[in-house]
């Protein structure tokens, strides 16, 4: 549950990725990183081989990222992340931290840019999935809210008359027989 609360804030998401990455010493991670950063780092270490296999299935990912193309990353990586449970969410964060570490070693971009890019992508994906989950439960909202959604707001008759174009011939043409 804590991982979901951290993903709600972009700054905390960035800090989590930074503290779980290889760019931070173990001593810093132990004293200042927090329990979740240590957990994500541990998941990343334990599943390194599986993460490597997953990245082998996505050829050209780092080349596209180095050229500034984000669509491949969004389509192949972000779209398949699973946030259904806190454990799967921690594994998704660990996978993105693994990508972060690997990309930093082979890019011309600064570490801060790469970290900001991955943190923002993770945060946006989390927010979009969370909003989709909330909207999936929309029919069980209180009756007042459901009634508002079923009946779109109507404009007062005075405003509707003002917006209608004046057509002096309206209704004067004889019906056309075909």
UniProtKB/Swiss-Prot annotation:
Keyword Membrane in annotation:
yes
User: One matching Pfam family, short form?
Assistant: Adeno_E1B_19K
The record's subcellular location field reads:
Host cell membrane; Host nucleus envelope; Host nucleus lamina
Which UniProt keywords are listed?
A: Apoptosis, Early protein, Host cell membrane, Host membrane, Host nucleus, Host-virus interaction, Inhibition of host apoptosis by viral BCL2-like protein, Membrane, Modulation of host cell apoptosis by virus
The UniProt entry's GO CC annotations, sorted and at most eight, read: host cell nuclear lamina; host cell plasma membrane; membrane
Give GO terms for biological process: symbiont-mediated suppression of host apoptosis
Q: Does the keyword ATP-binding belong to this entry? A: no
Per the UniProt record, which residue ranges are transmembrane? none
Write out the similarity annotation. Belongs to the adenoviridae E1B 19 kDa protein family.
What job does this protein perform? Answer: Putative adenovirus Bcl-2 homolog that inhibits apoptosis induced by TNF or FAS pathways, as well as p53-mediated apoptosis. Without E1B 19K function, virus production is compromised because of premature death of host cell. Interacts with Bax protein in cell lysates.
Q: Write the protein's name.
A: E1B protein, small T-antigen
What is the scientific name of the source organism? Answer: Human adenovirus B serotype 7 (HAdV-7)
């Amino acid at each position: 549950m804590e991982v979901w609360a951290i993903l709600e804030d972009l700054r905390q998401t960035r800090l989590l990725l930074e503290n779980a990455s290889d760019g931070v010493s173990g001593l810093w991670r132990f004293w200042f990183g927090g329990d979740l950063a240590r957990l994500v780092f541990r998941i990343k270490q334990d599943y390194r081989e599986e993460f490597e296999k997953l990245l082998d299935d996505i050829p050209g990912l780092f080349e596209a990222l180095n050229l500034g193309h984000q669509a491949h990353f969004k389509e192949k990586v972000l779209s398949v992340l699973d946030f259904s449970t806190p454990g799967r969410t921690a594994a998704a964060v660990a996978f993105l931290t693994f990508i972060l570490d690997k990309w930093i070693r082979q890019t011309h971009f600064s570490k801060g840019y790469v970290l900001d890019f991955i943190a923002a992508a993770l945060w946006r994906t989390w927010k979009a999935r969370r909003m989709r989950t909330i909207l999936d439960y929309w029919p069980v909202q209180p009756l007042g809210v459901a009634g508002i959604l079923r009946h779109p707001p109507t404009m007062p008759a005075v405003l509707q008359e003002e917006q209608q174009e004046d057509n002096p011939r309206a209704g004067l043409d004889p019906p056309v027989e075909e």
